[in-house]
Amino acid sequence: MAFKRKTRWLWQVLILSVGLNMLFLLLFYSAIFRKDIYKLHLFSGPLIAKSSRKVYLSEDFLNEISQASLDDLISLFKDERYMYGRPIKLWALSVAIASHHIDITPVLSKPLTYTELKGSSVRWLLPNIDLKDFPVILDYLRCHKYPYTSKGLFLLIEKMVQEGWVDEDCLYHFCSTPEFLYLRTLLVGADVQASSVASLARMVIRCGSERFFHFCNEESRTSMISATQRQKVLKSYLDCEESLAALLLLVHDSDVVLHEFCDEDLEKVIRLMPQESPYSQNFFSRLQHSPRRELACMSTQRVEAPRVQEDQDEEYVVQDGDSLWLIAKRFGIPMDKIIQKNGLNHHRLFPGKVLKLPAKQS
């Protein structure tokens, strides 16, 4: 009996010793040879690690490189100089990633990790990139027109919209991001049935990046795919006075809107929903025959007043293949009047853009 107990104890000690030796070997390999442990492929998933070091950092240098344009930063990718013990190309790449939202992960053979540098009053993250990878990164940036992260594409389109135009290729890239595809998954085809993908993109761009990425973060994309989450997202855009959000709520969630929305939110849906849409007309008919029909009567009185103005100032949603010349010819309105009414400084249009059409002169 004592022999068996002693044998079991020896086996436990042996297994523990082997485990500790393997751990020390991995740490030795990583520290002495400065290699990444996940290169050994011992783990099923990516091992993202950050290291931290205290160094001297000049705030003037950091401020100067932070204000550099993307073209200036990319030009530094060929620079072989060192600043504060680090290649200046690494400093430039860190700014390109953090400030200009450049995405280089498609050309990397391993997950992107960072080293945190701590100065007396500042902190800085430098990417752990092998200097041999910079030619590949340069080729990638030259060959791709929009090598940005999802947020970078969002901010770029947001800037274009403010200028009155959007590049369709950039819009296509944004609509292919995991965040936007998650939003479309939540809608279960409602965006296509009731409107268009371009109109949906226009809505989320107009309401800002903070709201969009709050709802479409990585945690939500993996665990929050439900009707409740869809209603929560659309309700948020409804609070932004978005007509499309009101319409999308009526495609799959009209029962929730009719029976569970408070009076204030229901009135908002009625006020914002496009009157000409079959979904709106069907919902309004159901509302008139429901216990909440008094809201239909109140909203009808409020909607009638703007319709007089609509006859004078019509709106048109740009479709695929439209041009200013075709729209002007279709509605019998001079092109210069449309340009003046919408404050355009060019003739480029993208699907989903809403044009205000001036009243026809008799």
Swiss-Prot record:
Bilayer topology annotation: Single-pass membrane protein
GO cellular component, one term: membrane
Protein's cellular compartments: Membrane
SUPFAM superfamilies: LysM domain (SSF54106)
Residue ranges of every copy of the LysM domain listed in the record: 314-357
Protein name, UniProt field: Uncharacterized protein CPn_0593/CP_0155/CPj0593/CpB0616
Entry's family note: Belongs to the chlamydial CPn_0593/CT_474/TC_0759 family.
Lineage of source species: Bacteria, Pseudomonadati, Chlamydiota, Chlamydiia, Chlamydiales
Top-level taxon of the source organism: Bacteria
TM helices/strands, residue ranges: 13-33
Keywords: Membrane, Transmembrane, Transmembrane helix
